[in-house]
């Protein structure tokens, strides 16, 4: 049978959604256990009046919780995207969609993405295109991705570990930073450069800022492992499939832990989205104290999004309660006050941060 690239890309998106929902795809330690916020025994603020609102790329959001890129590109993903969008609209959150490549290859799938603007007419929405696809198709594809969801910004994702271990992976990264720079110069909306689970170093952050990126989403190691996802996806019936499965398992530990990546990137510029293994409002508070502007969650929201609007809303409310309580106990009445919250960093995370900052 002839290889059908359009159908294959769409099928892969459904595979990813199913695997993330059904399998154990989290790997590693993002470093939050090594971060301890200093308790403020006299917080001098009213917990009931704590303000979670924040500004990001010229937009006011009701909370720093960002619904991270997850899905789209197959008819079976439309309902989840619609539910996530309704929650983003209801709670005043920013939201990113999954890679729009499938819908750009096959416009019949565009409604699996455009539904987010239908359901969230006022939300801050972020389009999504891979760096390789940007290099191959240029700003024209980026423009189509933006138009598809009426996006307020576009994320260019870096997923070269995933590409390296999937059978249909794009194996050349040559020219991607130049393509990002060209897009930043041409587009009228902000460009966000995002990793997808391996983190961003200070060196790469500086390349992104120099290229004109408006923000960086660190996508650190310690949350959903796309190496693990591809390992589950690999066909184990033949030698190549077994080899790819082993490769995915071997690289499950590859990457920069989220806390370390956040510290590195926040020291080079802003704004920064922290993501990768953030599982609670307490983790969010730690990220804000470390310099994050927004905190992205994907897997913790995907699972309730596959259940019901009520389950998803309950999860968001719990996260917000945890964040408010954490801020109160740090004496922070507003999000910007968390920048002044003291914290201790211990263990392996401290060691990695110290090793990355030689005297």
From Swiss-Prot:
Record's SUPFAM superfamilies?
Answer: FMN-linked oxidoreductases
Report which residue ranges the record marks as coiled coil: none
EC number(s) of the enzyme? 5.3.3.2
Catalytic reactions on record: isopentenyl diphosphate = dimethylallyl diphosphate
Isomerase listed as a keyword: yes
Q: Where does substrate bind?
A: 12-13, 99-101, 162
Q: Which GO terms describe its molecular function?
A: FMN binding; isopentenyl-diphosphate delta-isomerase activity; magnesium ion binding; NADPH binding; oxidoreductase activity
Single Gene Ontology BP term? isoprenoid biosynthetic process
Q: Where does FMN bind?
A: 68-71, 99, 128, 194, 224, 277-279, 298-299
* Cofactor needs: FMN; NADPH; Mg(2+)
User: Transmembrane ranges?
Assistant: none
* Highest taxon listed in the record's lineage: Archaea
- Keyword annotations: Cytoplasm, Flavoprotein, FMN, Isomerase, Isoprene biosynthesis, Magnesium, Metal-binding, NADP
Sites where the protein binds Mg(2+):
163
Q: Name one GO cellular component term.
A: cytoplasm
Name the job this protein performs.
Involved in the biosynthesis of isoprenoids. Catalyzes the 1,3-allylic rearrangement of the homoallylic substrate isopentenyl (IPP) to its allylic isomer, dimethylallyl diphosphate (DMAPP).
**Which family does the record assign?**
Belongs to the IPP isomerase type 2 family.
What protein name is recorded for this chain? Isopentenyl-diphosphate delta-isomerase
Organism of derivation: Methanoregula boonei (strain DSM 21154 / JCM 14090 / 6A8)
